[in-house]
A protein has these predicted regions:
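Bacterial N-terminal signal peptides
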Residues: 11-21
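Short, compositionally stereotyped local motifs that mark structural "simplifiers"
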Residues: 30, 85-89, 95, 136-317
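Middle-to-C-terminal accessory/interaction subdomains
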Residues: 130, 159, 255-281, 285-294, ...
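Short, conserved helix/loop micro-motifs enriched in His/Cys and acidic residues
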Residues: 330-337, 344-381, 459-477
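Activation on beta-sandwich/Ig-like modules and their edge loops
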Residues: 27-153
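Residue-level detector of buried hydrophobic side-chain packing
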Residues: 31, 53, 90, 118-120, ...
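Cysteine-centered motifs
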Residues: 6-7
Length: 628
C-alpha cells in the first residue's frame, strides 16, 4: 500500500457497527482493519514493519480519544491508552505495535498471527467494539468491507476505506500424500485440496503463485527436490504454502538441513545475496559484494534428524554470516533467524547432544569451517567438543554436523552452531538478554557500555596483582577460574588468530556477575599454516608477539600473582594429562571423524576441493595430537 516514513501513524478523511451500543457517539468509533503479519505494507519511522490496527470514526461528530483503551485481553488490568486527540467524522487513524514509551501512537503489545481478539473501551471502561481477528497470512488484513461485512483483504488499505477486493477467507491448504523425508526414485506424490480449487506447484524453491504450474497429475520423484503447493478458489485468498523436501536415494547418515527460497534472492547475478554482485571491490576481501550485505531474505528451513524425520519446518530469515575469510569461501556461512512475522520467533528443537538443556534458539549458524574450509574441516569444533565433553569452565558453542541442501541441490557439509549474542547467553545462562553486556576484542561494545570493562582492565594493568587485596578485587569482577580454562585451551591449540582477534567476553548486567570469555573461531590452530609450528611457544605468542593487546596484558598481569601462576600451570598440566593428552585428544578426534569422514569425498567434490589436502590435514592434526 505504501511507505510512510515521515510519521509512525496515519490519519485520513464507513463502518457498520459490529456490537450494538446505546451511546451513538461511542457506536461510531470502530476497529476497521487489522494486520497481524505486516511484512511490507506499512513501515514505521525506524524502518520496522510492525503489526497495526486501524480505527474509523464512522459518525457525524468528532470523537475525543482521550481515555479510550485498546487491549488484546478481555480483562486487561493495564490496557493501552489512546492518545489525547480528536478523530474527525469519517477520519481513519492507524496505530502500530511497538514500545509505547517511544511514541504515543505505538501500542505496547504484539498481535498474534494465528488469531487475536481486540477490545476497544471508552473512558468508563465500557466495551465499545470487539473484533475477533482470524489467522492471517503475511501482508493480508481483516476488517470491515464497504457493505459492513467482515472480510479478508489481500491488499490492505491502512488509513483509508477498505475498497480493495474482499475475500471470504483462505483456500484450503494442499495436502501431500507422502510426508517429507526419504523417498526412492520413482515415488509419486499426490496432492489434494478442497473441491472447486486449483492447485499450483513449484519445484525450484520459490513459493508458488497463480502463475506457477497447475497441478494435474502426480509428481514423480527422480532426485532430491523441494515440492511446494498452494490452492486457489473463487472468492478466496490463496492458501498457505504446503512444502516438503523429498530426499531421494540420499546416502548420508548425518542430519539434513533443507533451505528453500526463490532462486533469485540468493543467486541472481546482480541482486542475489550469495553472489559477488556488481559493486564489489576487485581486491580481497571484496568489500561491497552482495555477500557483505546485512540484508536478510526469507527461506523455508527444514531439519531432518538422522532417521530422516522432519523435526523443524518453518520460515526464517537468512543472511550471510562471518568475517573476511568465511564470506569469501565458495560455500558461504549462513545465519538463520526466527521472526514472529514468519509465524514463530524461536526455533525449537534440541539440536546439540552435548547441550541437552538447549531447546530454543533465536538464531542458528551454518558454518563453513572458515579458514579450515577444504582443509581439515574439524579444528574449531574439535576444541568446543573437548571443552563440552570434559566439563571445562568455558562458554563454548554447540556443534552438529549437517548436510545442507539449497532448493534441492546438494550444498555440502556444514557445521550447525549457536550464534553468540544476548539470546544465546539468555538461553545458556538464564540471564536477561536486555541487560547483558557483550564486548569484543579491544573492548569494542556489541551490547552495553564498554567503560566497565575498560576500568577493570586498566585496574589489572596498573596494580600489583600479587597484592592479595588487588587480586581479590579483580577476582570479584572477573571469572578467573573460567579464564584459566579458556587461556589454557586456546594456548594449547596454538591459535595464532588470537588474542588480538576472535575474542568476545560478557557479564550478566552492570551490577551482577563476573566477566567471562566466550570461545569461538579456532580455525587457525593445530598447524593450519606451514608457518605455525606444532611446538609453537604459546606463552611467547601471547606475551611477546601479541604484546600490547588488552587481553595479552591482562594475562601478563595476572601471571604476576603467585596463586594465579600456580593455578594456571597446574590446570594446564592437568588438561594435558587428561583430555588433551595424546590418547585423550586422539580419542575425541576419532569420535568426530567417525561422524563426518564418509561425507568428505562428496563435500570436497561439490566445492572443487582436493580430497588429498584433507587427508594431509588429518595427518597434521594426528601429529599435533601426538606431540603437542
Amino acid at each position: 500500500v505504501g511507505n510512510f516514513p515521515c510519521c509512525p501513524f496515519l490519519r485520513t478523511g464507513i463502518v457498520i457497527s459490529l456490537v450494538p451500543l446505546l451511546n451513538p457517539l461511542h457506536a461510531q468509533l470502530r476497529i476497521s482493519e487489522v494486520c497481524t503479519s505486516n511484512h511490507t505494507v506499512l513501515e514505521n519511522t525506524v524502518g520496522d514493519h510492525p503489526d497495526w490496527v486501524e480505527l474509523h470514526n464512522a459518525g457525524t461528530d468528532p470523537v475525543d480519544l482521550t481515555g479510550y483503551t485498546l487491549s488484546n485481553y478481555h480483562s486487561d488490568p493495564a490496557p493501552w491508552h489512546l492518545p489525547q486527540e480528536s478523530l474527525a467524522p469519517g477520519e481513519f487513524i492507524v496505530f502500530m505495535a511497538g514500545n509505547s514509551d517511544q511514541h504515543p501512537h505505538w501500542f505496547g503489545f504484539d498481535l498474534g498471527r494465528s488469531g487475536e481478539t481486540l477490545f476497544l473501551r471508552d473512558p468508563s471502561g465500557a466495551l465499545v467494539n470487539m473484533l475477533e481477528v482470524p489467522a492471517l497470512h503475511p501482508d493480508n488484513s481483516f476488517g470491515v468491507a464497504p457493505d459492513g461485512a467482515l472480510r479478508y483483504f489481500g491488499t490492505p488499505t491502512p488509513g483509508a476505506a477498505n475498497t480493495t477486493e474482499a475475500y471470504l477467507g483462505y483456500a484450503p491448504t494442499p495436502v501431500f500424500s507422502r510426508s517429507a523425508g526419504s523417498a526412492a526414485a520413482g515415488t509419486e506424490v499426490h496432492i489434494t485440496a478442497g473441491s472447486g480449487t486449483t492447485i499450483h506447484i513449484s519445484t525450484n524453491g520459490r513459493d508458488p503463485d497463480t502463475s506457477s504450474t497447475v497441478y494435474g497429475w502426480p509428481v514423480t520423484l527422480h532426485h532430491t527436490l523441494v515440492l511446494k503447493a498452494i490452492a486457489v478458489g473463487p472468492g478466496l485468498l490463496p492458501s498457505a504454502v504446503s512444502s516438503a523436501t523429498y530426499l531421494v536415494n540420499e546416502p548420508t547418515t548425518l542430519p539434513i538441513v533443507s533451505l528453500s527460497t526463490h532462486p533469485d534472492t540468493l543467486f541472481h547475478p546482480e541482486l542475489g545475496l550469495y553472489m559477488v554482485g556488481p559493486n564489489a571491490d576487485p581486491n580481497y576481501p571484496h568489500w561491497g559484494a552482495n555477500f557483505w550485505s546485512e540484508r536478510h531474505v526469507p527461506v523455508r528451513f527444514e531439519y531432518f534428524d538422522e532417521h530422516r524425520v522432519r523435526r523443524v519446518d518453518q520460515v526464517v530469515d537468512l543472511k550471510i554470516h562471518g568475517g573476511r575469510v568465511s564470506r569469501n569461501q565458495p560455500q558461504r556461512p549462513l545465519r538463520l533467524t526466527a521472526r514472529k512475522r514468519h509465524g514463530a520467533d524461536l526455533i525449537e528443537y534440541p539440536f546439540f547432544p552435548e547441550k541437552p538443556w538447549l531447546q530454543r534458539f533465536k538464531r542458528l549458524v551454518l558454518r563453513n569451517s572458515g579458514a579450515d574450509f577444504l582443509n581439515g574441516q574439524i579444528r574449531d569444533q574439535l576444541f568446543h567438543q573437548v571443552a563440552l565433553r570434559n566439563g571445562l569452565d568455558i562458554d563454548v558453542l554447540g556443534y552438529r554436523p549437517v548436510v545442507v541442501f539449497i532448493n534441492g541441490e546438494y550444498w555440502g557439509l556444514m557445521e550447525m552452531r549457536e550464534r553468540i549474542d544476548e539470546d544465546h547467553l539468555a538461553f545458556n545462562h538464564g540471564v536477561d538478554p536486555d541487560s547483558v553486556l557483550i564486548m569484543e576484542e579491544e573492548n569494542f561494545p556489541i551490547q552495553g557500555d564498554s567503560i566497565h570493562f575498560h576500568e577493570l582492565q586498566h585496574y589489572i594493568r596498573t596494580h600489583d596483582m600479587d597484592d592479595p587485596v588487588h587480586y581479590a578485587h579483580v577476582d570479584s569482577l572477573l571469572d578467573i577460574h573460567s579464564l584459566i580454562d579458556y587461556f589454557a585451551l586456546e594456548m594449547f591449540a596454538g591459535n595464532v588468530d588470537w588474542t588480538s582477534n576472535n575474542l568476545k567476553y560478557w557479564k550478566p548486567s552492570l551490577g551482577t556477575g563476573k566477566w567471562r570469555y566466550l570461545m569461538y573461531d579456532l580455525d587457525a590452530t593445530m598447524h593450519l599454516y606451514d608457518w605455525i609450528p606444532i611446538d609453537l611457544d604459546a606463552f611467547y605468542w601471547v606475551l611477546v608477539h601479541r604484546a600490547g593487546f588488552i587481553h595479552s596484558e591482562i594475562f601478563r598481569s595476572l601471571l604476576g600473582n603467585t596463586r594465579f601462576r600456580r593455578d594456571f600451570l597446574n590446570r594446564l598440566a592437568d588438561l594435558m594429562n587428561t583430555c588433551l593428552s595424546e590418547e585423550g585428544f586422539a580419542h575425541e578426534i576419532a569420535r568426530m571423524r567417525q561422524l563426518t569422514d564418509a561425507e568428505m569425498p562428496r563435500h570436497f567434490s561439490r566445492w572443487w576441493g582436493d580430497i588429498g589436502t584433507w587427508e594431509q590435514h588429518q595427518a597434521i592434526i594426528a601429529e599435533f595430537a601426538a606431540i603437542r
